[in-house]
Design a protein with these regions (language model features):
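Short aromatic-cysteine micro-motif
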Residues: 181, 208-334
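C-terminal, surface-exposed recognition/capping segments
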Residues: 275-278, 300-311, 317-318, 325, ...
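Ser/Thr- and Asn-enriched, surface-exposed coil loops between beta-strands
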Residues: 3-5, 46-53, 60, 80-84, ...
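GGW-centered surface loops in extracellular recognition modules
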Residues: 127-189, 193-196, 269
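Recognizes extended acidic, P/S/T-rich segments that occur
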Residues: 1-12, 65-98
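Pro/Thr/Ser/Gly-rich low-complexity, intrinsically disordered linker/stalk tracts
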Residues: 27-59, 113-127
Length: 451
């Protein structure tokens, strides 16, 4: 196999379709190969609190525009080669709004340079810490009690559209869609979570903030790096996982193969895992203040349809109809339209070490549960985001606690979550096991990109 540096063929940024064919003297040319879509843009990374580094610069881009939350802050000259780097000093930037984290992006500018934009990098919070929390996570009533700065906040559903006091609050106001290398991904900013538990390690309360919080008794504060969450269910093309609109979700693939297809995209990619899944789950609980996801939206009780069904919604969260396709914070099918495999749990153990995914682990352990109503999530203070099933209630009506079904057992089992049935035990916190090699016509996955 011969590799080729695509920079010498590619226009300055943008997207191009590349194909190839074999030629040899005395032989007929081969047919063209499959088409590969190559997308190029500048890359942005944080060097330290005062410096950002632009890589994959282009000679044709004589300058780079620097944006903070979409507002032009600076234009920095570039006179280097294709593939070069450029450091940007942001120490002198001023900001017009306190109480916000700023997402920095850059664009290359120059004659013949196609439209482009880097990934977003978040920089420090300006203003006082704002803490949004809920308690009551180990009570039989599904409703939660708002705490800290979330007291008095609310949300409403009208004509299948959600209006929420959290739309303007961190981190929800920064959960926007970005197009990165052809994928549609939702940005989750760097944040802190305060996670509380009782003497048995069962989850009792959770809070989110942009700055570190003080941990009280039986509480732990954890820092979460920024990451991207797939805006759509996973699709697979050419042995690689994508998050794209206008294509069918991929089913009938094992958890292990989904893992392989995600990693084929690069070292920073992975399929949905327990660690990142719980970050989103906790943010959902804080916004809606209920363990009963059905009380917010049910999601489509099937596994059909094309990705992008909710693209015409003009708000971050809503549904096409009661019980129809839904999205939350621009994440389509966050509940419903099929189950989704997630990594990080195997048999009766869990880990956040990606190198251990798909094998027996014991960083966090839990007991078998034979198909009942989930009553509690259990945490370990060393791994507080690996919230695993911690209790159950024999309640076939599923009208207490989390109101979702849980089944977990020892051996070579992997796990999925979500909804594709219309039963009351389906929902956001459903936890069900599969043989590791199993596939299903209603179980897919989702792409993550870490930073």
């Amino acid at each position: 196999m011969q590799g080729k540096d695509l920079l010498q063929f590619h226009m300055p940024y943008g997207q191009i379709q590349i194909t190839s064919k074999a030629k040899a003297e005395g032989y007929t040319d081969s047919d063209f190969s499959n088409v590969v879509v190559y997308d190029s843009h500048p890359h942005l990374a944080k060097v330290d609190s005062n410096t950002l580094r632009i890589s994959n610069c282009r000679a044709a881009a004589t300058s780079y525009e620097v944006y903070a939350n979409g507002v032009l802050k600076d234009t920095v000259a570039y006179s280097g080669e294709d593939g070069g780097t450029l450091d940007v000093d942001i120490s002198g930037y001023t900001y017009s709004q306190d109480g916000a984290i700023y997402n920095i992006t850059v664009k290359g500018i120059g004659t013949g340079v196609a439209e482009n934009e880097s990934e977003a990098v978040s920089i420090g919070w300006k203003g006082n810490n704002i803490i949004l929390g809920v308690s009551g996570l180990y009570q039989s009533a599904p409703a939660l009690t708002r705490t800290d700065d979330a007291v008095g906040k609310t949300w409403t559903m009208s004509n299948n559209v959600i209006s929420s006091d959290f739309d303007s609050l961190f981190p929800y106001n920064l959960m926007k869609r970005h197009t990165i290398d052809g994928d549609e991904l939702v940005f989750i900013p760097e944040l802190y979570l305060r996670i509380g538990h009782n003497a048995d390690g069962l989850l009792t309360d959770v809070a989110v903030a942009p700055l570190e919080m003080t941990a009280g008794e039986n509480q732990v504060v954890v820092h979460v790096d920024a990451f991207y969450f797939g805006a759509y269910g996973a699709s697979v093309l050419g042995g690689k996982m994508y998050s794209k609109t206008g294509v069918a979700r991929q089913y009938n693939v094992s958890c292990g193969n989904f893992r392989t297809y995600a990693k084929a995209r690069g070292a920073k990619y992975r399929q949905l895992d327990l660690y990142h899944m719980r970050v989103l789950d906790f943010l959902w609980l804080i916004e809606f203040a209920t363990k009963d996801s059905d009380a917010v939206m049910r999601g489509y009780t099937s596994s059909g349809g094309i990705c992008g069904a909710t693209d015409n919604l003009t708000v971050p969260s809503g549904q096409l109809s009661n019980g129809g396709r839904m999205r939350w914070r621009y994440i389509e099918d966050f509940i419903g339209n099929g189950l989704e495999f997630f990594d990080g749990a195997y048999g009766l153990g869990a880990t956040q070490d990606e190198s251990k995914y798909g094998q027996a682990v014991s960083d966090v352990t839990y007991n078998p549960i034979d198909g009942y109503c989930l009553s509690a999530l259990k945490i370990n203070e060393k791994y507080p985001l690996l919230a695993v099933p911690g209790g159950y209630e024999r309640n076939n009506s599923y009208n207490t606690y989390f109101r979702d079904y849980v089944h977990c057992g020892g051996g070579g089992y992997v796990y999925c979550r979500g909804r594709y049935y219309s039963s009351p035990g389906d929902g956001l916190f459903r936890w069900d096991d599969y043989d590791a090699s199993s596939t299903s016509s209603n179980t897919g996955s989702r792409l993550l990109l870490t930073l």
